[in-house]
């Protein structure tokens, strides 16, 4: 029987954990930003792709900052870890040497850049977004858990 600490030393274990953590947050992200906005119900009324810009995300940060930061931090960190682990696995299969320290450094850098971009979106809040558009955007959020259980 292998302890969790011994399993954690295996580089592939981290990639599997990151992939497992990525599934629910990626599903929430896709539902809120792609699937739900296509609905033809009021007040969403099929948000067009031109209306699904960064203001869609920034309104979410303005209304639910704790949840949004949790989801987007998980998305960035788990996504970067999963991508870097998968890249190393592919490189090993092709017979290339991999240096895990460089992979970890690159993953941290990638996650940091993604979070910096997320911070830039979040700091603007709902500035410049009309109240009607904010209501349409929040209707999208209210269709998806965890936002569906909150009052907004």
Question: Where do the PLM segments sit?
Answer:
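Membrane-embedded alpha-helical bundles that constitute the cytochrome b-like, heme-associated redox core
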Residues: 1-152
